[in-house]
C-alpha cells in the first residue's frame, strides 16, 4: 500500500465544474494535443494506475499529481463507458490538430467549387468519426443514425456553401471568406440534433443534486443539445473569423504576393493558434452537469417529481459534448 489516500474522487474532474475557470482548466487538459504523442505502453501504464486505484490498490510512491495525470491520460484515450481504446483521430486530444488542418484548408481553398465541396466533406467525415468514437454507452448511436446524420450534415454544409458562394460573387472578397464558417454552422445545427435524435424522442435522465435519477426529460435534452450547438459554433468563430480578416490584409502585401505558397501554411497556423484557446474555452461555456428548473419540465414529469420530492426546485442532466 502506498502513502496516497484512497479518498480522492477520480470519477469527477479535478477542478470545480461549477465555475467557468474550473471547467476551462479541465478542458485545457482534456484537449491537450500532446496526449496524441504518448505511446501505447504509456497509455497502458496510465490505465493500470487508474484501474488499480479504483480497486483500492495504490502504486508505491504515487503522488496525487501523478494520479491525476494518469487519469487524464486514461480519459484522453479510452472510452469512459466501454473501456475500449478510441481511434487516434476520434480522441478529444485530436480536436485541435485535426480541426486546425481541416479548417485551415477550408479557408484556403474556398474559391473553387470542387475543393470547397471536398473540404466540407472531409470536415463532416471527421465529425462523424468523433461522434461515433465518443458515443454514449447508455444511448449508443446506431449505424443508421450515424449515416443519416452524416449524409444530412454533409448535404447541408455543401448546399449552404454553394448557395452562399453564388450570392457573394459580386460582394467584396472578404465576405466570400466567411462562406466556410456559415456552412460549418449550418452543418452543426443539422448534425448534432440528428446524432442525438433518440434523446429527443425518449428524453435524457434527470437527477437530483445527489445524483438520484428522477426520470427522463425531452425538454432537458433540447436544452442540452442547444448548449452543445452553441459551444460547437462558438469554437468555430475565432478560427474561422479572425484568420480570414488577417489573410485578406496580408494577401494584398508584396510579401505574400511574391510567396503565394506561404498562404496555406500561414492560414493553418493562424487557425491552430485560435483553436488552442477556443476549443477548451467553448467546451467550458456550459457546465457538463447542467441544471433546469422543475417548472420547465414536461407536465407529467413535473407532477411526478413534485409528488415524490416536493422540496426539489432544480434537477440536473448531462448535456453531452
Curated annotation (Swiss-Prot):
It is found in: Mitochondrion membrane. It is a multi-pass membrane protein. One of its GO terms (molecular function) is tricarboxylate secondary active transmembrane transporter activity. Its main location: mitochondrion. The modification N-acetylmethionine is found at residue 1. It comes from the Eukaryota. Keywords: Acetylation, Amino-acid transport, Membrane, Mitochondrion, One-carbon metabolism, Transmembrane, Transmembrane helix, Transport. GO terms for biological process: mitochondrial transmembrane transport; one-carbon metabolic process; serine import into mitochondrion. The chain crosses the membrane at residues 146-164, 174-194, 225-245, 266-286. It catalyses: L-serine(in) = L-serine(out). GO terms for cellular component: mitochondrial inner membrane; mitochondrial membrane. Belongs to the sideroflexin family. Mitochondrial serine transporter that mediates transport of serine into mitochondria, an important step of the one-carbon metabolism pathway. Mitochondrial serine is converted to glycine and formate, which then exits to the cytosol where it is used to generate the charged folates that serve as one-carbon donors. This is Sideroflexin-3.
Amino acid at each position: 500500500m502506498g502513502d496516497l489516500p484512497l479518498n480522492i474522487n477520480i470519477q469527477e474532474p479535478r477542478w470545480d465544474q461549477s465555475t467557468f475557470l474550473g471547467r476551462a482548466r479541465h478542458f485545457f487538459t482534456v484537449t491537450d494535443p500532446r496526449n496524441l504523442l504518448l505511446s501505447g505502453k504509456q497509455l497502458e501504464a496510465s490505465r493500470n494506475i487508474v484501474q488499480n486505484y479504483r480497486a483500492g490498490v495504490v502504486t508505491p510512491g504515487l503522488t496525487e499529481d501523478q494520479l491525476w495525470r494518469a487519469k487524464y491520460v486514461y480519459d484522453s484515450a479510452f472510452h469512459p463507458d466501454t473501456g475500449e481504446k478510441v481511434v487516434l483521430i476520434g480522441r478529444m486530444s485530436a480536436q485541435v490538430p485535426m480541426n486546425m488542418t481541416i479548417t485551415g484548408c477550408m479557408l484556403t481553398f474556398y474559391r473553387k467549387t470542387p475543393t470547397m465541396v471536398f473540404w466540407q466533406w472531409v470536415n463532416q467525415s471527421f465529425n462523424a468519426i468523433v461522434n461515433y468514437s465518443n458515443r454514449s454507452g447508455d444511448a449508443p448511436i446506431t449505424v443508421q443514425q450515424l449515416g443519416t446524420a452524416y449524409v444530412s450534415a454533409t448535404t447541408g454544409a455543401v448546399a449552404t456553401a454553394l448557395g452562399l458562394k453564388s450570392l457573394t460573387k459580386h460582394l467584396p472578397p472578404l465576405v466570400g471568406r466567411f462562406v466556410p464558417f456559415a456552412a460549418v454552422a449550418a452543418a452543426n445545427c443539422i448534425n448534432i440534433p440528428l446524432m442525438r435524435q433518440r434523446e429527443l424522442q425518449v428524453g435524457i435522465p434527470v437527477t437530483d443534486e445527489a445524483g438520484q435519477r428522477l426520470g427522463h426529460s425531452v425538454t432537458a435534452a433540447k436544452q442540452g443539445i442547444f448548449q452543445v450547438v452553441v459551444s460547437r459554433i462558438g469554437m468555430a468563430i475565432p478560427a474561422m473569423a479572425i484568420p480570414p480578416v488577417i489573410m485578406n490584409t496580408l494577401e494584398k502585401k508584396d510579401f505574400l504576393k511574391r510567396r503565394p505558397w506561404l498562404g496555406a501554411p500561414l492560414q493553418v497556423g493562424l487557425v491552430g493558434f485560435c483553436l488552442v484557446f477556443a476549443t477548451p474555452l467553448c467546451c467550458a461555456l456550459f457546465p457538463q452537469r447542467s441544471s433546469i428548473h422543475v417548472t420547465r419540465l414536461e407536465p407529467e414529469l413535473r407532477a411526478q417529481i413534485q409528488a415524490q420530492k416536493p422540496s426539489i426546485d432544480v434537477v440536473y442532466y448531462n448535456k453531452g459534448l
